């Protein structure tokens, strides 16, 4: 859910899609966040619509949000599946004040790197080398010092195969790798 704003005529303006919902501001720039809160998700060829006939076949190259158990199961874990070369997951917004490291939790069958940027064009980014060949969730991390302030985070997979993205963790000097919230 996003906060709605009225214009001077009393009409509602279109709300920006964010990962914050009704948080009334950016999310804290440290801690563990599940990939399912992505507000942007697209493949190398753009976004896909799943309200078309036979979306599984039509959009087989696109990432999507799914879960590991049936609907209604309280223990189901949601994640982004099928991230292939060029796939992007975007999250808005975080108040990042003292970043030191960023970690990601993945599984699947892929070899490449995850680029992390505060812009969707990835002109400046940090790179996390990854190699997975298992359905077991694995962690990868790198230093993060270039992103500060009220920032979006975009994750772009570049490589071979297909990976699943479960969560990411932002670390600062104050909480350097206290992994109590990880799976």
Residue locations for each model-derived region?
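Extracytoplasmic
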Residues: 12-183
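Beta-propeller blade signature
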Residues: 1-7
